[in-house]
Design a protein with these regions (language model features):
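Terminal targeting signals and extreme-terminal segments of soluble enzymes
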Residues: 1-76, 82-147
Length: 147
């Protein structure tokens, strides 16, 4: 997978809680923004999803908090695909303090491709699935053809 960041941003004072660090609701929001940048790299752009009547839904999300982020910290998220199936992808985001390089949090997601009209899961188009397979993390090669 490309090593370009899927999210870059800043921790603002209003995003911090009474303990003085970024509140968990903002971690979730920043990871969500990274999701959409990752999906766009695979060809799942907002316009293609609208035009095709498709969508993506998170069905599992596991966050591990490693280090706190404070107001003014610059945040960067890098993402990698771990598994590609006919109707779903599993991927990992690493949120880092861009200044120190320390991992602040990780988030593993399972995202399912949806037919919005039928309101149920749908297979990825072959071009999307092939693009996803090409972006698989090299450490996870046995999962490239999972179904």
């Amino acid at each position: 997978m490309e090593t370009d960041a899927t999210y870059r941003g800043t921790v603002y004072p209003w995003q911090c809680d009474h303990v003085g660090h970024m509140n968990i609701m903002w971690y979730v929001g920043k990871f969500d923004e990274a999701n959409w940048n990752l999906f766009a790299r695979l060809g799942l752009t907002p316009s293609s999803l609208r035009e095709s009547g498709r969508g993506m839904a998170a069905v599992q999300q596991n966050i591990a908090y490693k280090r706190e982020l404070l107001a003014g910290d610059i945040v960067e998220i890098r993402s990698r695909l771990l598994e590609v199936r006919d109707k779903s992808v599993r991927f990992l985001h690493e949120m880092r303090n861009a200044e120190t390089g320390e991992i602040a949090a990780t988030c593993e997601f399972v995202g399912v491709h949806l037919d919005r009209k039928a309101r149920k899961s749908a297979p990825f188009a072959p071009a999307i699935r092939n693009a996803a397979i090409k972006h698989l993390d090299p450490a996870e090669p046995e999962l490239a053809q999972a179904t």
